[in-house]
Amino acid sequence: AGEPDFDTIDYVKEAAIKAINDGQTKYTIVDGTPELKDAIIEKFKRDNGLDYKRENISVNSGGKHTIYNAFMATLNPGDEVIIPAPYWVSYPDMVMLAGGTPVIIEAGIDNNFKIIDR
């Protein structure tokens, strides 16, 4: 269910211990601290040649949470949302909670898990 099958890398452990020792133990800004956004911006620039500003970056607690937030922010009652199958079991419910209508489209192994026009 998404849990890693490897130990946490040492530099991540060390950074977490340092943050605790530095008193960084409170809730942070909901969509990401400036330092985290700057690190994400630098990663996209370095690895992908993409330029973003802080206001273009929003950090969330996971993929499903991000998708749910997007549905809640953008769907109008009755909007159709295409969900490629196979899909995570909660996707249709997330669409319906936001007032949308899920439309399931098969995108299985025969199509290399891509939606194709028939």
Where do the model's predicted regions map?
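N-terminal small-domain helix-loop-helix segment of the aminotransferase-like
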Residues: 1-62, 69
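A conditional alpha-helix N-cap/helix-loop micro-motif detector
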Residues: 60-64, 113-114
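Short beta->alpha connector loops
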Residues: 63-65, 87-88
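PLP-dependent aminotransferase-like
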Residues: 72-118
